[in-house]
Amino acid sequence: IYIKKINTLYLYANKAKETFKQYHQLLAFIENETFTSEILKQKQAEIKIENQKASEIFLQLSKILDAFDQRNNMIIGVFANSFALRDLHHCHRIEQWIDTYLEKVHSWFEVIAFFDAQNSLANFQFNHPNFTFPTIVDHTTSLKAENLGHPLIAQEKRITSSIIINNEEFFIITGANMAGKSTFLRTVSLAIVMSNIGLPVCATDFEYTPIKLITSMRTSDSLSDDESYFFSELKRLKYIVDAIKDQKYFIILDEILKGTNSTDKAKGSRKFVKKLVDFHATGIIATHDLSLCEVSEELSQVQNYYFDAEIVNEELYFDYSLKTGVCKNMN
């Protein structure tokens, strides 16, 4: 009469068996470690219930699931169930364990995830001893970086740039294709995200005011959602405008309104930048549209920078260095 329910429980239990066996070992590592950091001690304390350890509780369930799995043995499956209702006994033990520890299990998984994340972050710092931990400031400077580079570019190939952007300033970056605009935007974005989670950044010196990041860099169309590329862009830009009404964000925009004609793109980009300035936004926009740089003549908050391209020995040459002003050589 209970065979269908027992089989359903066994199906789920069998999937979870190896997970609990592995997580029992992870919890044991956390419990047996000696930490000096207060936050790590606090997280370690969360995996204890009175005199019981979370690892022991997970091990207990793991053993129950192992025993339940023996129902596939012909002798145990037939004789033990015939005389001792073994499957029902193990189902009762599993459900009893769930009723007892259900509310705690979720928080224990979160503790494991926390230590896993911290371990990954610590490994990154260990592997990059030359990177710099950011200095948190609380004044007019939003971000100040010396020799800022992209952490995923090899050191021997990496070209760094220095930048100072104050609160409520907006940078317009122009440059030829392949000159380094998008890489620079990703570099700044990564530096902010890495700083926000406590990682060192690829720079010799880095000061910033902690701030959330919001971007529009790789918008795509969607056949399944019946959205054109242009409509997806508009949705993303509207999302950004709505977001900055309530909170401060550092905004990164890469070549917006690519889904429309050049005339509408120029007009729309100019109005959008002015809208962001009206909201006292801080950020960077990269563009091929040199006319957008004229906004700096109307608004003091807007600054122009560029990445240059030159013809050297009849070949296109990029130095990937950020310079003040408007790009003169476009490809």
Language-model features and meaning:
Residues I1-A176, T183-L213, K235-R236:
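Alpha-helical coupling/stalk and coiled-coil linker elements that connect catalytic or binding modules
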Residues L121, N127-N331:
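ATPase nucleotide-binding head domains, primarily ABC-like/P-loop NTPase cores
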